[in-house]
Amino acid sequence: DMLQGNKSISEMIELCQKKSAAVSDLLSQNQLKAVEEVKQLEKSYRTVMLFYKNTDSDKIKNISIVNASMEQLTDLDNSFFIDAIADELRANYDRLDLRTNYSLLVIPGYLGSNKVIEKWAKIAHDNKVMIYTDFADLEKPDDVIEMFFDSNLSGGDVYKSNVCMACNYLVGRGRYAELGETEDLLIPPSAALAGSVYKTVMAQVTAGKKYGSMSEVDGVAFNLKKSEISELEKIGLIPMVKEYGKVMAFSAKTLFNGDNLGLQTYSVVRVFDWVTKVLMDFLNRRAFENWNSKAERDLRGQISKFLDSIQGP
């Protein structure tokens, strides 16, 4: 068309540049629209990816993944998914052989209300599973503290000791500035934390510079002062902190705030639950043996030997 229009070379160059700019702008708009459309899916995939990355394992054994939206996991009126997960946990715990029982339940994102969290907490407590989930994605630590206080999520009920709640969302990827995206993609930190918990010795909390560092994470939603970290830890949250050039968890609290200090620390709760399940499994295997003084001594001896082998220094 330009050649047939008898235009000069300079006019043709200018026209080509205008068309190229228009096409480039249209491409950027369409790419940005595509990014916005798949954002929730991208969040989900990146969240699962960070769980795997933080296990530091080439292959993970004994894992089950449920494809469910947050709406399905918080709907108490139509509790199909909640019941299905509860049945799966119960089927592997309410039995004689406990080798296939679950120990971690990861629910990335904010469950939204105290009644929903209590529903999940009771399921976890009944099956001796530790839940890792998240608080709301907010922009400032003061907002987190205020909203958490108003939500009344922590409490003295024993089942609250089976829930850990992280805050300060992770930067899953930086924003695409060339496309006009204005904000980084933030993802819930509970999956990355649970991945680190998966690889760490059960009695050791996954927190601090040495044990709490998150792999392949560059940043967090907001920076935290030492006083703010202390306040978040005090109210029962697990804040993600960027210091020393890395992102780390800086608390080991559960949502339990009763008098029993042990139940406020998730490593203690997990060890208690594990020891209970080991002893239950052991005694199930010794059921209906003839009972005499020799059998009693043998049983007591094996239990004492096991408990001695796992005691601290």
Regions found by a protein language model. Give the residues of each.
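A short, well-structured beta->alpha microelement
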Residues: 67-94
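Short linear motifs in intrinsically disordered/low-complexity regions
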Residues: 2, 57, 68, 76-78, ...
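Charged, low-complexity intrinsically disordered boundary/linker segments
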Residues: 43, 62-71
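Structured, hydrophobic secondary-structure cores that serve as assembly/anchoring elements
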Residues: 3-43, 47-50, 56, 91-313
